[in-house]
Amino acid sequence: IAHWNLWTWLNNLIPLAETEQKEQFKEALAACLEEFEPTFIEHYTTGLCKKMGLPHFHKDSTECGLSFLRILQTEQLDYTQSFIRLQNKEYKVLRDDCLDIRQFDAFLTQYENIREHQDTDELDANMQEANPIYILRNHMAQRAIEAAERDDFSEVDRLFKLLNHPYTRQPDLEKPEDLGPLPSDVPDVAVSCSS
């Protein structure tokens, strides 16, 4: 999607070029696009490996990371909380959340095999830098908005402080509902891109 968006945006720039320079401009844009995909993939896989606590140079790290993402999608698990559980080595909790136990067990075996002979202190530090504990969720924002509409800005202030340091546990500021999605029996707040 990012590649297509960039291609579309760059093609909209072509009419801005002088007539005699349009071919050169098109060639320059094509060269930029050729560099985009490998650069994007490199940054994406590096980021994924950091989130997973895996060494980027290991031949199986990217596939292991993609396997975990497939599990999150298939099992409809919370992305943020699943990465925090992986970071905290809460493998049993993650496993218990899965219907396809064999898929999770295969992932975990591969994951542990990759990490087995690595400097896990460094990899764990990478995970902590890449996985926020707190993210602004719709229900959190809605709660703050509703309070602010009543001229009570305490929730806005609390969220501002909490989200200012999303990678650090803040038990004095957090509420249980800050740590994950609402339970399925509580209606979620739907928002649009223009909200």
Which positions does each model-derived feature cover?
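Regulatory N- and C-terminal appendages and interdomain linkers associated
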Residues: 1-195
